[in-house]
Regions:
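Acidic donor-binding loop of glycosyltransferase active sites
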Residues: 235-247, 260
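Short acidic alpha-helix that forms the nucleotide-activated donor recognition element
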Residues: 70-73, 226-237, 257
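Membrane-proximal helix-turn-helix segments that form the acceptor-binding/catalytic region
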Residues: 67-70, 112-129
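A charged, aromatic-enriched C-terminal amphipathic alpha-helix characteristic of glycosyltransferases
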Residues: 298-358
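Short hydrophobic beta-strand element within catalytic cores of glycosyltransferases
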Residues: 261-265
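A short, active-site helix/loop in glycosyltransferases that binds the activated sugar's phosphate group
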Residues: 88-89, 109, 125-147
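Conserved catalytic-core segment of nucleotide-activated headgroup transferases in glycan assembly
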Residues: 19, 139-220, 224-227
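Conserved acidic donor-binding segment of nucleotide-sugar-dependent glycosyltransferases
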Residues: 278-286, 295-300
Length: 404
């Protein structure tokens, strides 16, 4: 069988590209021929350059590389992988079957307008969706009436696992990618700022981007790190904060495999794939996210329970398990099997963590742990940071400083 994939240009550290090449390698291991057509953004000059980039960024893939979208030849299946590649696949006449490898609801990457609606239109081209996770399949079924297949969020257990020799710290790690709006870096940083004021001893680790940003509290920015270093980080920290406001990220599942409790947002996209036993979902206000993080930091027994439940949930969700699901989905398309979609139910059934963000003139002194930050230092920080929300948490701090 001969398969072609149409891919957007590479982004270093891109989990989406890593997932695509992992599944291309899955088909190669089953004897498929795979051609990969990659958007020409000027960074590569030849197919050989593309191969070297893949080896450097994602670990390598023995497919046949093509620079640009000039597709030629006949294929048993042609895959679109991003909204602007879907039209290329739709219009190509020499593919027996056409599929859509969907990892995100990409319309959400754009403000409402042309970009949003054109991305939505890509789901109307009659391509057969194979999605990562259940939420996207649910969305394709219910909103686009498109029979869809999915494979689960899995983790590489050779990389992500508990390490007993790593010393635990009272620390939070946050996937900080300000170049990706769906990662909500502003909300995440504001939530971490609240935690840092209330628990100044808690360490904050940022990772996932080499952009430093203008962050007013003490932290360590690790930049783009290897997946092995990610696992060490997850083993070192008390809780991980990973925000994805579109499709779920693979990162929370990798954190769970490593035994790290996870906090993410209580949004519809997270309710179909994330278990309420291993993940805590918070309302999208910074105060609510901060409260969810503090609940785990302040209660070791809760952290231990989440860690155990997360590891148990990921126990059988190895990469090989996901590959087998993906391979069966491709095989169904090749043999023209009818895709019958049963209703997909939510698996996260706990309520969201919601903090009170209403400004009040009077706050009980015992509402939050008394601060240990020196008065002068905290006052200076508050004066110079004009972007802080005067929320209940920060008003509490201010009242404590004034002695109210």
């Amino acid at each position: 069988m001969k398969v072609a994939w149409v891919l957007p240009s590479f982004i270093e550290g891109s989990g989406g590209h890593r997932t695509m090449f992992q599944n291309i390698n899955c088909l190669l291991s089953h004897g498929y021929e795979c051609d990969v057509y990659i958007e020409d953004n000027g960074d590569a000059k030849s197919a050989d350059d593309l191969k070297k980039q893949v080896e450097r960024f994602f670990g390598g893939c023995n497919c046949t590389y093509h620079l640009g979208f000039q597709i030629s030849g006949e294929y048993d299946i042609l895959f679109a992988t991003a909204w602007f590649t879907a039209k290329v696949v739709r219009d190509y006449p020499f593919a027996k079957r056409k599929a859509y490898f969907i990892q995100d609801f990409e319309a959400l990457f754009n403000p409402m307008g042309d970009g949003y609606l054109l991305a939505c239109t890509s789901y109307c081209y009659g391509l057969s969706p194979i999605t990562i996770g259940k939420w996207l399949t649910h969305k394709m079924q219910t909103e686009y009436l498109s029979p869809s297949q999915y494979f689960d969020f899995c983790a590489d257990h050779n990389v992500y696992h508990p390490i007993n020799s790593v010393q635990k710290e009272e620390a939070i790690c946050f996937i900080y990618q300000p170049d990706k709006p769906r990662r909500c870096s502003i909300i995440g940083i504001e939530a971490l700022g609240i935690v840092k004021y209330l628990r100044p001893h808690v360490k904050i680790y940022l990772y996932g981007s080499n952009v430093s940003g203008h962050i007013w509290f003490d932290h360590t920015n690790l930049g783009i790190i290897s997946i092995e270093d990610c696992n060490t980080l997850y083993n070192k920290c008390t809780v991980g904060l990973c925000i994805s406001s579109s499709n779920p990220s693979r990162i929370p599942f990798e954190m769970m495999a490593a035994g790290l409790p996870v906090v993410d947002l209580y949004l519809d996209n997270n309710l179909y794939d994330m278990p309420d036993s291993g993940v805590v979902l918070a309302h999208y206000t910074p105060e609510s996210i901060a409260q969810a993080l503090l609940d785990i930091i302040d209660h070791p027994e809760k952290a231990a329970s989440l860690s155990q439940a997360g590891r148990e949930y990921m126990k059988y969700r190895t990469l090989e398990y996901g590959y087998e699901q993906f391979y069966r989905a491709v095989d169904n398309l090749l043999h023209d099997r009818t895709i019958v979609n049963a209703p997909i139910e939510k698996i996260y059934n706990s309520p969201p963590v919601i903090a009170d963000v209403i400004v009040q003139n009077s706050i009980k002194a015992d509402s939050y742990q008394r601060l240990t930050i020196p008065r002068k230092r905290l006052v200076d920080i508050l004066k110079h940071n004009r972007n802080l929300r005067k929320s209940r948490l920060l008003r509490t701090i201010w009242n404590l400083i004034k002695g109210n």
